[in-house]
Amino acid sequence: MRTSQYLFSTLKETPNDAQVVSHQLMLRAGMIRPMASGLYNWLPTGIKVLKKVENIIREEMNKGGAIEVLMPVVQPAELWQESGRWNDYGAELLRFVDRGSRDFVLGPTHEEVITDLVRREVSSYKQLPLNLYQIQTKFRDEVRPRFGVMRSREFVMKDAYSFHVDKASLQETYDVMYQVYSNIFTRLGLDFRAVQADTGSIGGSASHEFQVLASSGEDDVVFSTESDFAANIELAEAVAVGERQAPTAEMQLVDTPNAKTINELVEQFNLPIEKTVKTLIVKGATEEQSLVALVLRGDHELNEIKAQKHPLVADPLEFADEAEIKAKIGAGVGSLGVINLNVPAIIDRSVAVMSDFGCGANIDGRHYFNVNWERDVAMPEVADLRNVVEGDPSPDGKGVLQIKRGIEVGHIFQLGTKYSEAMKATVQGDDGKPLVMTMGCYGIGVTRVVAAAIEQHHDERGIIWPSDEIAPFTVAIVPMNMHKSESVQQFSEELYRTLKAQGVDVIFDDRKERPGVMFADMELIGVPHMVVIGEKNLANGEIEYKNRRTGEKQMIAKDQLLAFLKENVKA
């Protein structure tokens, strides 16, 4: 491709509204342009990268035995009503009515559509297992689109769905897809972790997220220093450390009128925060136990996903308001504790091993100090309620935990029969009876992968694509003052024709621009291999080569250039 015949839309300045690096660089590199909130036009440089990512995904999915299909973005409401998600999905589901007064949605996902398709096309257990995938546009009406294509309303996703006679068959395909995803992200050159995850609104049992490690990520990824354990922080088990020590002091009731938070209590009374507990009141799962107390160490954070899975706690988790708490317990939120508490309590594992701790007295403006289990108050039910922290023991007993930020680029689920049962998707089993199919689903955010690669691989000059396979161009020909030098022009044109004939994705900068502008643009869009052709070097039989990824520069003999590029260009 010649730049003179290309829409080369680079920007010198960073747009003010771009918050994260990937958004800034995708705008500056001329990859995307905003159209409306969370909606983007993909320009030629961007679409080249997007299609290359899609092709890698497609190749690896095909190798894993999946079969490509394509389903409509527009979906009839009846399917969502049949699955039960019409009322459950929330405002992210964009609903509309066609000219015939029929309800439709713009698909945020395709579980309903694929289940309907397969129940119509597959009738016998002999046709299973079956794994179908598509690469298709999705729409989720995000309340706050942000970070460019990282969290946009319209995006491209690869979603696959597998159908099975039983869970054992599902597990086999799930394991294959786990490996396929690992192959995809390895081939893309990304530093990622596959982590245990919560299934969320999709439903099902087992689930893994594929997280690209980046400081701009929205998720906390937990992994061990000495094993392959990795989990989303929502699912990482917090292991209690040590044994409960014997009491060393008598319990005291202390006036604390100005201490309404843990931090105020610690500051005013010079207490170690790890010797305090906080009591949170949430809605209970039943009318008989309408409020439940969750008790954590003062420096720990509640893990809401863990808490709402407890049978006593309402799902989704909902905190009680102050009026409810005051009416039931008789004290405000700043004075709550485990002594004389008249609602069921669940304490975190770390609280169960505490001794001589401080807590609210359930009397406004008062706290108990030096509280001990069994001696001063009976031990309530113990559960894992908190987020892990850096340095906690790994749940598998190997090493300690590290926590890094991650960008979720893929997610695989074992759905089970949630959708097939609701939508009566059955086949004839080997006994001749109807058999509800067991399902799995497997998603990759294709547009998000592009942004995640940039978040992880960039410098002050622009994008550094982690793999030649996804760079918009793999080789840039940058001729110095070509329009004033016949020898430079002749060699550049000949090299361009040769590389094109060899199938190399090459960009030839034939603009009448200053060399500095040409270098800056090629570095900004991240072309991995740059061939710089100057009149003086050419006369000496040499060509300058620059590697974008390593920063290396070297002189190559003119007659060795093609062999050098063949050896070093990976795509």
Curated annotation (Swiss-Prot):
Transmembrane segments: none annotated. It comes from the Bacteria. GO terms for cellular component: cytosol. Keywords: Aminoacyl-tRNA synthetase, ATP-binding, Cytoplasm, Ligase, Nucleotide-binding, Protein biosynthesis. Its EC number is 6.1.1.15. One of its GO terms (molecular function) is ATP binding. It catalyses: tRNA(Pro) + L-proline + ATP = L-prolyl-tRNA(Pro) + AMP + diphosphate. It holds the Pfam family HGTP_anticodon. PROSITE patterns: AA_TRNA_LIGASE_II (PS50862). One of its GO terms (biological process) is prolyl-tRNA aminoacylation. CDD domains: ProRS-INS, ProRS_anticodon_short, ProRS_core_prok. It is found in: Cytoplasm. NCBIfam families: PRK09194.1, proS_fam_II. Consists of three domains: the N-terminal catalytic domain, the editing domain and the C-terminal anticodon-binding domain. Catalyzes the attachment of proline to tRNA(Pro) in a two-step reaction: proline is first activated by ATP to form Pro-AMP and then transferred to the acceptor end of tRNA(Pro). As ProRS can inadvertently accommodate and process non-cognate amino acids such as alanine and cysteine, to avoid such errors it has two additional distinct editing activities against alanine. One activity is designated as 'pretransfer' editing and involves the tRNA(Pro)-independent hydrolysis of activated Ala-AMP. Belongs to the class-II aminoacyl-tRNA synthetase family. ProS type 1 subfamily. Homodimer. This is Proline--tRNA ligase. It comes from Actinobacillus pleuropneumoniae serotype 7 (strain AP76). The lineage of its organism: Bacteria, Pseudomonadati, Pseudomonadota, Gammaproteobacteria, Pasteurellales.
